Amino acid sequence: MMGPQGTGGLVVAPGVEIRPLKTGGTGVQSYRREQPEEYPTRLESGTLNGHGIAGLSAAVDFLNEITPAAIHAHETALMSAFYQKVSALPGVTVYGDFAHERAPIVTLNIGDMDSGEAAEILSDDYGIAVRSGAHCAPRMHEALGTVAQGAVRFSFGWFNTMEEAETAADAVRDIAL
């Protein structure tokens, strides 16, 4: 949601009993050994993440102002422009189904270059941050035959520009040639 990590919410139907896995002190009843029974303090051990809550609130305000539809359209346009350029490059293998709706992510390999090496070149020579390796998806890499090489993942977001997407595609072209 564009807010800080480590902040979230919990929606529970009336009558559902929740017992915390771990408990700790509360600022409400500091001398009690047991967690309070009343909600929400029963689930709020320790100090609340005030900064995270404020950041999450700002993220919600931002999303309400910009709208998720506008963000989706922007990210999709960036991803599509990047994909159109890199998918036509000789020696570049792009993974995934781009004929249907998808997340604004393009995963690829450049020839037989190790994905970590490609990511390092993109970072050092072009100032482009990507993710390389197995992406916590070892079975997918087994299916693709990319276990040893990994893959390079480009992720596009609201704060990226079309110029950045085109620059990234040009960098892939330069490395591939």
Describe the role of every protein-language-model region:
Residues 1-177:
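Pyridoxal 5′-phosphate
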